[in-house]
Amino acid sequence: MRKSILTLSLAVLMGSFGANANPAEGKTRVEMGINESNLLAADQNRYTYKNMQEFMKTKNVDSGASTPILLSYAEQQLGDVHFLHQGKAMTLQGMLEKHRADAFVVLKDGKIVHEQYFDGQTERTQHQMMSVTKSFTGIIAATLVAEGKLKRQVQISEYIPELKGSAFGDASVGKVMDMSNNVKYSEKYEDPNAEVFQHMKTIGFAPMENDYNGPKTIHEFLSTLNKEGSRQHGEEFHYISANTDVVAWLIERVEGKPFNVVLSERIWSKLGMDRDAFIIVDDEGTALASGGLNATARDLAKFGQMLVSQGKNLVGEQVLPKEAIQSTQNGGDVDAFEKGGYGAKGEVFEGWSYRNQFWHTNNSNQAYTALGIFGQWIYVDPTENVVIVRQASAPTSINDVWDGEMLSAIDAIISQLHQQ
């Protein structure tokens, strides 16, 4: 079975996986019984994912002073989408309702062909994106590599001496960016001593006990991590959120600015975004670059369109270097991906790879995607010039069957748009 793809799904915060049919629309946090112990629970997340600033420390990601670049609607909209998944007939509308989507936006050639919101969400709602955040971190790092400011072959400790004695010290920048480095990091939520719990305690997703004496910030936590066994860096894919927070630390060290500022200067202020974004931070103000971004669906679609446009925004300005986009679009190490327990025959991500903090399909269209638990997607198809954004509040963090259904729906959407 596929391993968990994000460390933010802590069982203690999840509560019951059974979802109530009643939506969050029109309800207050009090009426929904939300407290620090159930922020990610199956019912409460329909409210919390749309209102994370009420619960977490955050920093702003400034969209800049320029006028937003408005997305226009295509003359021909996406019609009803019907598809088969493992022999079962499904519809796009039925799947979105089943998966508890909050927003679904599709762009073709830079124009909206489908836009839909659920459960009180609107085009102005800043929605929690979980591990989709990783891909923003990765593409900024890839940009610094393209500019010569960051070198993939150089060891992490050359940039961050504070990590010299940790598992990251002798790992290369590229291995950490592609998550093939050796780090002992457990995501066994039934084990209270698992590293995932300490990681999440640093930003408030898990409570610190009165007698807790472990790391209290993201950077403190990263410096405590060690290797596991004798596995060499680069041998196999090992997806852990700690890697992304190291990449963000690299970005801050090279740029000399906080991550939220770099994200604003490099991306958010360059794409004509409709709104600022915000990102969850720890007590020191360090951003949770592995899973803390909150943004509107339309703004995420603009980011996706920049990727399929080889780094250009909607008015043709070069925002990120084409080399960074191509490096991502070319995909990663398929063998390492499969050795890590992903991508084997019959798995939902069969034949995929991981590059620059994106999941790569390795299909003929060179499509790749940003993924976050509970149903967050930014899927980009550079060949067909299609971007698909989904925000959701799914009742479970990971569901391979639902991921498979989503991919079947995406194939049907792209096929229909190709024929229009």
Q: What residue spans do the PLM features occupy?
A:
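Active-site-proximal alpha-helical segments within enzyme catalytic domains
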Residues: D178-M179, A242-L250, A289-N313, Q376-A392
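N-terminal leader/targeting segments and the immediately adjacent pre-domain N-terminus
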Residues: A19-Q121, D178, N182, L222-T224, ...
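Gram-negative bacterial Sec-dependent N-terminal signal peptides
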Residues: M1-A21
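Active-site helix/loop module of the DD-peptidase/beta-lactamase fold
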Residues: A146-K188, K257-G291, A295
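Structured C-terminal helix/loop/strand segments within mature extracytoplasmic catalytic/sensor domains
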Residues: N22-N35, A367-Q420
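Active-site Gly/Thr loop motif
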Residues: M273-F278, Q329-V387
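Catalytic-site signature segments of enzymes, centered on catalytic residues
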Residues: E123-R124, K188-E190, T202-E284
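Active-site SXXK
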Residues: G110, Q128-R152, V176, V247-I251, ...
